């Protein structure tokens, strides 16, 4: 069924279709089942796999527990790349240190960050420097300008301000005035212009 779904998508668009998978489910032997599963879904024509480096436990664990149990198995993902060298393999699961994770690119094609950058999005400003040797640094003032544009565009589209702003507060974790900034951003009494005007006060933007 997974292969059929992927085949239908690849047949209906020129946009590259990818799949995100786990190493297996429940009591499956991932040494036996994983390669077979991938050989089947690759018949759909996809060329890129995002691989979460642990099994999915469908019985006995809730979604939160499934994020940490069972242990991560990066080595199995590395071997997957060895078995399928012509397929782009992107690693996902437990990645939380750019400097350490960079070494994983010797065995793989890419890294997929999830919870880590959702909780600490300001860390993304380090990506170009660490992974691409860029000499440019994104300062917080530039990010505030980008937030202003993003808020205004989404406000014009009618999206909920709360759903947008609740992720923005994480940009300022670790800043001296993070609590004050969080209160400003999440305030129901301030419009977008007022929020941005306050955030542009440089004394607040101290890491």
What do these predicted regions represent?
Residues 1-207:
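Flavin-dependent oxidoreductase catalytic cores
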């Amino acid at each position: 069924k997974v292969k059929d779904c992927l085949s239908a998508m690849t047949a209906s668009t020129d946009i590259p279709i990818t799949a995100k998978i786990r190493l297996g489910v429940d009591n499956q032997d991932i040494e036996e089942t994983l390669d077979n599963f991938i050989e089947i879904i690759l018949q759909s024509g996809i060329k890129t796999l995002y691989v979460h480096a642990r099994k999915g436990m469908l019985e006995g664990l809730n979604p939160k527990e499934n994020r940490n149990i069972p242990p991560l198995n990066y080595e199995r993902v590395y071997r997957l790349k060895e078995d399928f060298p012509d397929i782009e393999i992107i690693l996902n699961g437990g990645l939380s240190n750019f400097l350490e994770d960079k070494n994983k690119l010797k065995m793989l094609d890419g890294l997929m960050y999830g919870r880590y950058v959702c909780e600490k999005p300001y860390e993304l400003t380090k990506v170009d420097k660490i992974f691409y040797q860029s000499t440019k640094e994104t300062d917080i003032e530039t990010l505030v300008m980008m937030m202003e544009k993003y808020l205004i565009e989404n406000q014009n589209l009618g999206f909920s301000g709360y759903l947008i702003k609740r992720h923005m507060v994480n940009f300022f974790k670790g800043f001296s005035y993070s609590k004050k900034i969080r209160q400003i951003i999440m305030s129901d009494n301030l419009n977008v212009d007022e929020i941005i005007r306050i955030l542009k006060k440089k004394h607040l933007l101290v890491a």
